[in-house]
């Protein structure tokens, strides 16, 4: 459960860190959005160091959680209801993430 929570917090940090500069560029937001965006990306990189396995495996497993959090962001922040295809994609990526993240350690 701790691993999953860490993945979710890491994904939120990455999404916020990318969303704020996007909002500045795409929607003419304040240039001050870049500061919390940069801090959020720094937090994202720092959080990755807490994942206790090889970096490649962390990134692969984290990708599934990122997809799920991004679709949740779509719904909660962008106010776009996810389609059945979105939800099927999330289910598939979380299944893949679970296989990678929770494999037996030999």
From Swiss-Prot:
GO CC terms: plasma membrane
Keyword Ribonucleoprotein: no
Superkingdom as given in the UniProt entry: Bacteria
Major subcellular site: membrane
InterPro entries assigned to the protein according to its UniProt record, in alphabetical order: UPF0060
Location of this chain's protein in the cell: Cell inner membrane
UniProt KW Transmembrane keyword: yes
Keywords, comma-separated and alphabetical: Cell inner membrane, Cell membrane, Membrane, Transmembrane, Transmembrane helix
Topological type in the membrane: Multi-pass membrane protein
TM segment ranges: 4-24, 30-50, 58-78, 82-102
Pfam families according to UniProt: UPF0060 (PF02694)
Family affiliation: Belongs to the UPF0060 family.
UniProt xrefs under PANTHER family: UPF0060 MEMBRANE PROTEIN YNFA
Stated name of the protein: UPF0060 membrane protein Bphy_5052
